[in-house]
Amino acid sequence: RVLRPNGKFIVTTPNVLMSLTRNPWHVREYHADELKNILECEFDEVEAMGVFGNKKVMTYYNKNKKSVARITRLDILDLQHRLPRWMLQWPYDILNRLNRRWLYDENKTLTSSIKMSDYSIGPVADNCFDLFYIATKK
């Protein structure tokens, strides 16, 4: 037993629906209902929320999405989904850093202006960046 009665387990994890490509550093990514179902097997109460971005964050996300699409279109053999995680980690790191640097250089004002206050927590939905769940053990 890890939690006392009425103890809370708080977890955040990426929302697979908003992931732009396979991240080899993530062992598993979840859909909202999938994670909720897993938690409900062990916890009496599960509060499902999501982390959302405002218009500025979504503008950055869409620019990043286009940039990632330019990179992944070169993966004609779909190796990102066929190779084991460990083989993708260093290429992912290199390409991710190059992509983030390019995005910053091309969008300095936007990138520099994004703050924590541009994010909010609300009821879970398909367009949340991260799943944020609070599970309570009775």
Describe each model-derived feature in a short phrase.
Residues 1-136:
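S-adenosyl-L-methionine-dependent methyltransferase catalytic module, highlighting the catalytic core
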